[in-house]
Amino acid sequence: MNITDVRIRKISAEGKMKAIVSVTFENQFVVHDIKVIEGQNGLFIAMPSRKTPDGEFKDIAHPIDTQTREQIQKAILDEYEKVKNLDMQE
């Protein structure tokens, strides 16, 4: 499944969450509310999730295999770096 669009909405507030992202696949299916998070080992993505009654977070949508997760994460983080660098130049 090819990623055909990545839309980044940067978060300006201080904190670990840096952006909220929408990813489109094959110009036919979109996943909203993927988060870019600054962790101890650098940036990573968190798939959209909801909080269960017992306080646990469960993914609403997520990749089934590691290769797909890595492909999605690379596309998102590459686009995030482009957007971040554009903002720094302005």
UniProtKB/Swiss-Prot annotation:
Output the superkingdom of the source species.
Bacteria
What keyword terms does UniProt attach to this protein? Cell cycle, Cell division, Septation
Q: Which InterPro entries match?
A: SpoVG, SpoVG_sf
Single Gene Ontology BP annotation: sporulation resulting in formation of a cellular spore
Q: Outline what the protein does.
A: Could be involved in septation.
Cross-referenced HAMAP family: SpoVG
Q: Which family does it belong to?
A: Belongs to the SpoVG family.
Kindly provide the name given to this protein in its UniProt entry. Answer: Putative septation protein SpoVG
What is the taxonomic lineage of the source species? Answer: Bacteria, Bacillati, Bacillota, Clostridia, Eubacteriales
Q: Which gene encodes it?
A: spoVG
